[in-house]
């Protein structure tokens, strides 16, 4: 017996959507993620925070970096929309044995407990979006700069 599956696009993504002004989670949402990512001017901005998942936008300036970090209890997915960089990962902060050049269209998958950093090696900002499961940052987080992000994380003991 043959099984036929029909798939329908029940929602259309408004191509004119701008960067969300605030975190819309946990309400149901549809956004143009590529456009929102490219328009983002903040170092980090949480645009949707649910109970088990969080979506953030990031802008890493030329010569900048996310900063070496490790999330013991969550997996992370990053998607580069523009820019070029070098991602480093490993089992300890001293042993980052995995390295790869990344650019537009690359997806970076970071397992829980893995030390990682993304360094901008290009002349323009890296624009990316990141999914955390479970959420990593407080609902509504906006850090205009890496310095603000570092200060907030120091207060939260990340």
What are these regions (language model features)?
Residues 92-111:
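Short acidic-glycine-tyrosine-enriched beta hairpin
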Residues 57-72:
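Conserved short histidine dyad/triad with adjacent acidic residue
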Residues 73-91:
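Glycine- and acidic-residue-biased ligand/ion/polar-headgroup-sensing regions
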Residues 57, 87-89, 128:
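Short hydrophobic/aromatic-rich beta-strand segments that constitute the beta-sheet cores
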Residues 68, 87-88, 110, 116-122:
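Short beta-strand His + acidic residue motifs that chelate non-heme Fe in jelly-roll/DSBH
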Residues 2-54, 67, 100, 104, ...:
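A short, N-terminal "cap"/entry segment at the start of jelly-roll beta-barrel domains
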Residues 35-38, 94, 119-158:
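Double-stranded beta-helix
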């Amino acid at each position: 017996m043959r099984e036929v599956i029909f798939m329908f696009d029940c929602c259309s993504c408004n191509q004119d959507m701008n960067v969300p002004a605030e975190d819309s989670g946990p309400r149901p949402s549809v956004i143009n993620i590529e456009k929102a990512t490219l328009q983002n001017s903040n170092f980090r901005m949480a645009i949707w925070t649910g109970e088990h998942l969080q979506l953030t936008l990031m802008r890493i300036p030329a010569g900048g970096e996310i900063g070496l970090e490790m999330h013991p209890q969550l997996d992370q997915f990053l998607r580069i929309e523009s820019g070029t960089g070098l991602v480093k990962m490993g089992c300890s902060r001293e042993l980052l044995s995995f390295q790869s050049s990344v650019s537009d269209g690359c997806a970076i998958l970071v397992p829980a407990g893995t030390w990682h950093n993304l360094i901008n090696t290009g002349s323009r900002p890296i624009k990316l979006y990141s999914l955390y499961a479970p959420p990593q940052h407080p609902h509504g987080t906006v850090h205009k700069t890496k310095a603000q992000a570092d200060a907030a994380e120091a207060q939260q003991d990340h």
